[in-house]
Structures are given as structure tokens and as C-alpha cells.
Amino acid sequence: IFTKAGSFSYANILRTSEDFERVKNVEVFKDEYKGVKNFTSYYYQYFFTMALMISIVYAFFAQRDNGMWVLTYGSSGGRARYALKQTFVLICAGALIHTIMYWSTFICSMLQNGGFADLNNPIQNVEQFAKFTYPLSKIQYVMLLYCVSLICINCISLIMWAFFVLFRNRNYALIVILIFSAIEQFIYYHIDVHSVWNVLHYINIINLININGTLSSYRNWGTGTFVFPVFSVIIFVLIILTCVMVY
């Protein structure tokens, strides 16, 4: 009512109305939701996966310590082939580790808390998804979260790999990454989502690893009449940054 046509606030109101229109026919009712709720709230499996990915990246650069990198990089096309092989191995390892960790955690949560029979019910039956604007079932959301979190983990792993390339000593690279992660964690927990600096909260390594919090919520960014979901902006920036770093 009090916003001006052509402003972001006005455009955001219209966009919000359109987005929630998608779930206007979703009927919410009480069911066995604790299995999915506890699983989506649990995030340690993502950090454990990232710890394993860091160890794999660290192992990639063992030749920096034994001097074999000179032979590898000095051969015809050696550096390019080696980089392609490492990229392929890293993506496959990320997919394998994440798949095992993700689905084993999901199964354990469902066995412990119940809810297998209600997986086809709307995800909005879980209170924390009250602002989720897509008419998905619980199992559909779990599969969506799997795909999105896999993209995030692989992108972050590739960025770390590219960062290791910048350092002659892999131990220095590891130390810098750990310090950066600690700073990101501090920022993530000390900048509120309503702050004018909330971009540092959302485009943050902690938020990217535990992407469910952003995926399941509703918030838009934009300027003028251009309105974009925060989640879409985060994934777009992550993919662009990954391509730039790997290139």
C-alpha cells in the first residue's frame, strides 16, 4: 500500500504474491514429520564430507613435497592432463562421498524418527518449510536438497583445489583455507539475515555447505523492478566463481 510503483519494495511484493500462488492449493495437515525435520536440520554430514574433500585435495599436491611436480609439469601437456584428471577424480569423489553420507544419514533419521509412510505428503507439513514456495512432497524436497548440496560441495571442492594450485607449499594453502573458513564462520553467526550486510551471511562458505537453511526459506534480493530469489543468486555466484577459479 505504501510502496511506490517501480521500486524494489513494490516489485518484491508482486513477486512474493506470485511465488506463494504456487502453493495456494497445498493442504497442510498433521503427519509423521520428525524424520524429515530432523534430517534437514542436521548438517554435520556436510562438514564431514567437506573435511574428506579437503584431505583429498591435500593429497593431490603430495608431489609438491617430493619434487615430482617438476617432472609432471615439465612433460608435454603434462600439466593440463594432470589438472583434468584431478578435476575428474575430485568431482567423482565428491559425488560418491556425498551420496553415501547424505542417504545414510537420511535413512538413519527416518528409521529413528519414523515417517517413511508419509514421504509423499507435502513438505509444508514440516513447520520450518512454511515459507517454501514450491509444491513438493517430502521425498521430492529431499532429492532436490541432495542435488543442490552436491553442486555446492563439488564447487567448493574445486575452488579449494584451484586455491591449492596458487601455493607452492600445500601446508600454507591448508592453513590459509582453515583461517578463511574460521573467519567465514564468525561472519555467518554474527551477521543477521536482516542486516544490510546480509550478503556476507548468505554468500558464505558455511551457508553454502549447509544450503538447506537458504533453500527452505524465502528471501529476495534485487534493485528497481528486478527481483531475484537469494538462493538463485547464491548458486549463480558460486558457479561463476568456480569457473573463474578453475580456469
Where are these regions (language model features)?
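Secretory targeting signals
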Residues: 4-63, 84-166, 186, 207-232
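Short helix-to-coil transition segments within interhelical loops
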Residues: 73-79
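Membrane-helix interface/capping residues of multi-pass secondary transporters
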Residues: 79, 169-170
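Junction motif at the cytosolic side of a transmembrane helix
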Residues: 162-166, 233-247
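Central hydrophobic cores of alpha-helical transmembrane segments
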Residues: 171-184, 201-204
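A cytosolic-side transmembrane-helix exit/cap motif
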Residues: 192-200
